[in-house]
Amino acid sequence: MFACAKLARTPALIRAGSRVAYRPISASVLSRPETRTGEGSTVFNGAQNGVCQLIRREFQTSVISRDIDTAAKFIGAGAATVGVAGSGAGIGTVFGSLIIGYARNPSLKQQLFSYAILGFALSEAMGLFCLMVAFLILFAM
């Protein structure tokens, strides 16, 4: 956020020699001339508005900004993929409980098995949902 705007300048800004280019990018983007009142003449604000638009455009489409967006996509997709491991653990827990329940009371075999299938389906659905969100983050944004 405190990256100096002079590192991300266009050739037009270099020729203009504007003092705005030496301010931090956050200050250049957030201090819009149209939001300030009573500060200088309208001619100066109009000229500075053009320079601020150039800086804002360069700030929004810079290589660093795209790299940050790509890194955020990969981090988000990785975090969403962790849910698939939770699904595997849930399936293991469900069938482990089925075996323990069957060992304790073999007469409830059919009812325990139907509950185990229901638990398996819910765990698998959550895992697939997490995987779908990861793919959406990667390829739809």
From Swiss-Prot:
Pfam families: ATP-synt_C
Modified residues (N6,N6,N6-trimethyllysine): K109
Superkingdom of the source species: Eukaryota
GO terms of molecular function: lipid binding; proton transmembrane transporter activity
Keyword Cell cycle appears in the UniProt entry: no
GO cellular component: mitochondrial membrane; mitochondrion; proton-transporting ATP synthase complex; proton-transporting two-sector ATPase complex, proton-transporting domain
Membrane topology: Multi-pass membrane protein
Listed transmembrane segments: 82-102, 117-137
Residue interval of the organelle targeting sequence: 1-66
GO biological process: proton motive force-driven ATP synthesis
Protein's UniProt keywords contain Nuclease: no
PROSITE patterns given in the database record: ATPASE_C (PS00605)
UniProt KW keywords: CF(0), Hydrogen ion transport, Ion transport, Lipid-binding, Membrane, Methylation, Mitochondrion, Transit peptide, Transmembrane, Transmembrane helix, Transport
Subunit: F-type ATPases have 2 components, CF(1) - the catalytic core - and CF(0) - the membrane proton channel. CF(1) has five subunits: alpha(3), beta(3), gamma(1), delta(1), epsilon(1). CF(0) has three main subunits: a, b and c. Interacts with TMEM70 and TMEM242.
Other comment: There are three genes which encode the mitochondrial ATP synthase proteolipid and they specify precursors with different import sequences but identical mature proteins.
Protein name per Swiss-Prot or TrEMBL: ATP synthase F(0) complex subunit C3, mitochondrial
